């Protein structure tokens, strides 16, 4: 291995080590309470070295968010694996349950998705990085849009604006999962997460169905 190749490998290993440290710190302290000093200490690097790799706490979150979006899309792709054509309702149900599995199996990534909401995050990262996150996010939303458009073409759904309907479904999923993340709210509602999630998804599908 050449000296240059070794340095590049060491640089990438350091970058990944810092991201792992940030992941641990953000989960332990919460993104908003965590500081760059905390991350540098956990990664065992100087603060100056940390800033050579990531210019802000939001930039660290952005890179973790990209990891999470990649993981989410893998769940969605797996959900669509089938040896026969899927109906529009089957597609939406599979998307819904894939998102729930993502929430259950990758709760840290779900928390990062929620932490990235807000004007401050958008303004704190570079336009290029923000566009990368936006593009990755759109891939998942587009799968929902395409399923709704399929239902409209087949006469199963009545919907004037599939993209707006997809946004509503996304808000519905996140609303249920965020609500049920809190023990007090779960106790208030008195049903399990999967039960409420299924009820919300089926209510959405009933609203989409074209009149008989």
In which residue ranges do the predicted regions lie?
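Membrane-interface starts of transmembrane alpha-helices
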Residues: 158, 162-166
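Short hydrophobic clusters on alpha-helical segments that form packing/core surfaces
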Residues: 18, 22-26, 68, 99, ...
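Hydrophobic alpha-helical connector segments
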Residues: 63, 78-108, 166-169
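Short, basic, alpha-helical segments at the C-terminal edge of helix-turn-helix-like DNA-binding modules
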Residues: 66-72
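Short secondary-structure transition hinges
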Residues: 101-146, 163-164, 190
């Amino acid at each position: 291995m050449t000296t240059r190749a070794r340095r590049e490998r060491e640089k990438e290993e350091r970058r990944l080590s810092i991201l792992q440290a940030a992941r641990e710190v953000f989960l332990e302290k919460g993104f908003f309470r965590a500081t760059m000093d905390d991350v540098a200490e956990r990664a065992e690097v100087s603060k100056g070295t940390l800033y050579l790799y990531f210019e802000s706490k939001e930039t660290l979150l952005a890179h973790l968010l990209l990891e999470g979006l990649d993981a989410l899309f893998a769940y969605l792709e797996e959900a669509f694996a089938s040896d026969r054509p899927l109906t529009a309702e089957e597609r939406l149900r599979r998307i819904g349950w894939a998102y729930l599995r993502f929430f259950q199996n990758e709760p840290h990534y779900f928390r990062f998705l929620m932490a990235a909401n807000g004007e401050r995050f958008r303004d704190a990262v570079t336009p290029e990085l923000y566009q990368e996150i936006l593009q990755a996010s759109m891939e998942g939303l587009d799968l929902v849009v395409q399923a709704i458009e399929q239902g409209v073409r087949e006469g199963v759904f009545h919907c004037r604006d599939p993209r707006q309907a997809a946004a509503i479904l996304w808000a519905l999923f996140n609303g249920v999962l965020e609500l049920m993340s809190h023990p007090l709210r779960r106790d208030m509602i008195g049903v399990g997460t999967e039960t409420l999630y299924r009820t919300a998804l089926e209510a959405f599908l009933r609203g989409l169905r074209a009149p008989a």
